[in-house]
Amino acid sequence: MIPMEPTPSEPTGLDFAGTCDLAIWCKLLHDKGWSGPRIARAIAKSEGYVNNLIRVVERASPSIMLRWRAEQSGLVDHVCATDWLVAVCLLPHDRQDEELQRRIAARPGYRV
């Protein structure tokens, strides 16, 4: 039997810099027509987790997305926990930004 070569439509061996990158990839694949279960199988995560990441990317304010992305590089302290993002992204963008500032200010010795 001849081994199958991976097709360009299947992401293989991708390394993600962090959860934000993973979420953006999930959203991209979803926009390309992949179902939640298919994405979940491809990245070995639960369908619920994948759907939550997609929802965060769809609903997060630009400030939240920029902060979340910056946290992956280690330039700022981590405040964008996934469970917090899922909850806060149900709010309007101005409220999301207020909650982000409140969360940053609540950290002891925080770096903006």
Locate the predicted segments by residue.
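Amphipathic alpha-helical "recognition" segments
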Residues: 19-37, 42-109
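Short, Lys/Arg-enriched anionic-surface-contact patches
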Residues: 2-24
